[in-house]
Amino acid sequence: MASFRFAAVGDNCIDRFLPPPTRSYVGGNAINVAVQLARLGHQAFYFGAIGRDDDGAKVRGGLRDNGVHVNYLRERDGNTAYTNIDVTPAGDRIFVYEDFGVCAGYRPEPADFEALKTMDHVHIGWLDDGGALRRALSMAGVRVSQDVSVNAAAANVGVEGLSIAFGSAGEDDSRAEHLIHDFLTGGARLAVVTRGGRGSLASDGATCAAAGIRPVQVVDTTGAGDSFIAGFIAAHIAGRPLAESLHAGRDLAALTCTHIGGFPQDPQPI
């Protein structure tokens, strides 16, 4: 299998599972994507910020333990981001509270941007920069994707210039089709939308593909969408057709649903 250089930029957090909050896991869209790409055998680099605290040390350790390069992990004054999560009996998660901590306001430094330009593909997670990094990478000719679903503020959800725009429509087929249309007309070259238990769709405007889910015994869905993104990106950049890329994302997402957290890790105390 060919190995590629991937970067994931943006959010990290400590997922605190309720009730009560007695155990925690390292997570976040960009972190989870980076870890899953590394676990697939690729070179993965994480670009983001942590606090100078115990939670920041947990994030750094989680990345290193999974082979993700932390050369561009920055420490800032303030707390590491955290999320309080409740899990339903069916394994679905409810985000009770989010504190973005030092992830808020993070921007790659000039030297970081030069490093990003050397990557085969860059994925952006939650990033409150008004789309500045997306536009700069696109103008530099870098393949870049972003998960629009984790960026709630309108200023941060543009798709123009994206090689791949990812989104989530729940199980609403009509909304999924609208998102595909909006991403493509908005300037993304490829649109990929997950539909929960109904699977996923992808289209580049000329070719469309769909995939169902892989049934598993669900323990926790946290990070399943991030794993889907990693699996899809890795397959797509290797030249696999849209349908096969969706299947790769589906299979990795299904595996993630069989354990707690966005990637296999031992729980840590709060």
Feature map (PLM): residue ranges:
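Glycosyltransferases and closely related glycan-assembly transferases
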Residues: K117-T118, G131-R143
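Conserved phosphate-binding/catalytic region of the ribokinase-like
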Residues: M1-R5, E177, H181-I270
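Short catalytic helix/loop segments, enriched in acidic residues and glycine
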Residues: R23-L37
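Conserved N-terminal subdomain of the carbohydrate kinase-like
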Residues: I14-S24, H42-H121
